[in-house]
């Protein structure tokens, strides 16, 4: 039995040597989530197995699947661009690495089988049902201490008071640990006192300062190797510790507190399990740890606990998911660089069932900038269209979708086609009566492409009133179009000089017409 500070420190050092390569959770050492540009290897040109793709919302449409199966030479999805985030095995080291893969096949053979498995996996994600964790914390609050038991703790309470102003943490820990030992020695084998009840009582009543909480966390770690021999007991203690952390401290947390708590977590992991022990943690404690790691900016641990909750069929609170997404954005500084987007996909891969069935407006807003191909954007828009809060979500995200559509290519005809696709997807949500504020945004986007036909069609169909201010916006957009696409599609139907002349004469006032004269 380990009872002294010297013994615990010796044991901890041995554990540290053993755990250097694995820490609290070893898997992430083998699967680095933050992408390393040096690991983008030629092997990524090979089409990955459907199970290696970690994209959480891309679903090829029936037309995309048909086109891929009907193309004899180099059939592809996402135009064969290297934008499918995947976890693949390095061909030499056999380590798992994060890469952007091409979904471009050598020939038509096996494409149908590949698509069937990929679609089946996406369907499985859609069918996952998640339910919120029970918020009953009664089992954590029921401490099995009678008034007689509490009276036996007077000596321990006195020790805590006496050492309050002592700066030497090690001596304070040893004093409390020795008094705990005295209590159990006096009470002999007939004791009704359990170590977890005593520690939970002390944390609840004396852990109101950071210093005391750090002290009690260290005492808990020492007791792991003597009287705390069940994970059920550790669930109770961790619950009270994490409640105090949240109540006592405003982020950022004290580095000393963070170190003490993470040392305790590592010791728990090593004491009861050779690898990962979250399977034995209560869902409420897992949510607490998830919140804690999000606040401390530990994205790897946050991802682990979030993924564990989802695999257990538990739906995390929307506020927790939002904080997790904010932490990702903070870490990557809302970057849209290729490396950063790939890494972001790794951190949200586990969110697929939530995106499919429980998506929130904040989640959808986070995902839109991550789309690197129009087909990804359509997949996301179709998920929103089928969601329970479709109208509210589209109201909040449609302007972002419209803006994003124009970032995939500079070709005005392709952009016009993509804008029309988005409009056709969202129109049924409004019963074909798309609000004029959104129609006006579509018109301005068509103006940026120099598409006079679609502008005229939408103005007439939705009876858009062309105020002086709005006409000036259209003119500015058309001028930008002429600068950006001066040599493109000038003779195409809907874009040529005849359509331009017709649009100017019918829809613009005399004063505005002159601004567009050659």
Swiss-Prot record:
InterPro entries: Aep1. Signal peptide: none annotated. Pfam families: AEP1. Keywords: Mitochondrion, Transit peptide, Translation regulation. The keyword Transit peptide applies. It is found in: Mitochondrion. One of its GO terms (molecular function) is translation regulator activity. Residues 1-19 form a transit peptide. One of its GO terms (cellular component) is mitochondrion. The keyword Transit peptide applies. Required for translation of the mitochondrial OLI1 transcript encoding subunit 9 of mitochondrial ATP synthase. Belongs to the AEP1 family. This is ATPase expression protein 1, mitochondrial. It comes from Saccharomyces cerevisiae (strain RM11-1a).
């Amino acid at each position: 039995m380990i009872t002294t500070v010297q013994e615990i420190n010796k044991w901890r050092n041995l554990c540290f040597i053993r755990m250097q390569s694995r820490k609290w959770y070893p898997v992430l050492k083998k699967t680095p989530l933050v992408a390393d540009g040096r690991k983008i290897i030629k092997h990524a040109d090979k089409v990955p197995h459907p199970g290696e793709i970690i994209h959480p919302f891309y679903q090829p449409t029936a037309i995309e699947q048909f086109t891929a199966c009907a193309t004899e030479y180099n059939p592809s999805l996402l135009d064969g661009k290297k934008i499918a985030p995947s976890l693949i095995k390095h061909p030499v080291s056999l380590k798992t690495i994060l890469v952007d893969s091409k979904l471009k096949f050598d020939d038509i053979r096996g494409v149908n089988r590949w698509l069937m498995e990929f679609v089946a996996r996406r369907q499985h994600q859609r069918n996952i049902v998640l339910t919120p964790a029970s918020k009953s914390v009664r089992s954590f609050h029921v401490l099995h201490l009678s008034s007689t038991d509490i009276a036996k703790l007077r000596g321990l309470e006195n020790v805590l008071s006496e050492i309050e102003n002592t700066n030497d943490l090690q001596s304070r820990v040893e004093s409390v640990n020795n008094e705990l030992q005295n209590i159990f020695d006096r009470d002999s084998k007939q004791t009704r006192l359990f170590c977890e009840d005593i520690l939970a009582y002390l944390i609840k009543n004396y852990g109101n300062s950071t210093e005391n909480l750090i002290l009690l966390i260290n005492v808990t770690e020492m007791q792991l190797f003597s009287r705390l021999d069940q994970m059920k007991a550790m669930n109770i203690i961790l619950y009270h510790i994490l409640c105090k952390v949240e109540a006592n401290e405003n982020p950022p947390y004290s580095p000393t507190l963070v170190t003490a708590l993470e040392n305790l977590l590592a010791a728990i992991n090593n004491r009861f399990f050779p690898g990962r022990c979250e399977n034995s943690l209560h869902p409420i404690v897992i949510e607490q740890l998830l919140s804690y790691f999000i606040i401390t900016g530990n994205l790897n641990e946050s991802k682990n606990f979030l993924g564990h909750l989802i695999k257990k069929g538990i739906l995390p609170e929307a506020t927790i998911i939002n904080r997790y997404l904010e932490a990702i954005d903070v870490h990557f500084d809302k970057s849209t660089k290729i490396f950063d987007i790939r890494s972001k996909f790794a951190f949200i891969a586990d969110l697929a069932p939530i995106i499919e069935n429980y998506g929130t407006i904040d989640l959808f807003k986070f995902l839109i900038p991550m789309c690197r191909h129009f087909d990804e954007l359509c997949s996301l828009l179709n998920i929103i269209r089928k969601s329970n809060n479709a109208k509210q979500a589209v109201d909040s995200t449609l302007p972002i979708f419209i803006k994003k559509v124009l970032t995939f290519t500079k070709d005005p005809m392709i952009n016009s086609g993509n804008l029309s696709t988005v409009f056709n997807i969202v129109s049924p949500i409004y019963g074909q009566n798309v609000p004029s504020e959104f129609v006006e945004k579509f018109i301005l986007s068509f103006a940026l492409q120099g598409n006079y036909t679609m502008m005229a069609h939408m103005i007439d169909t939705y009876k858009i009133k062309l105020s002086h201010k709005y006409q000036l916006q259209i003119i500015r957009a058309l001028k930008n179009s002429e600068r950006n696409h001066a040599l493109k599609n000038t003779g195409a139907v809907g874009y040529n000089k005849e359509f331009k002349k017709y649009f100017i004469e019918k829809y613009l006032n005399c004063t505005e017409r002159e601004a567009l004269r050659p």
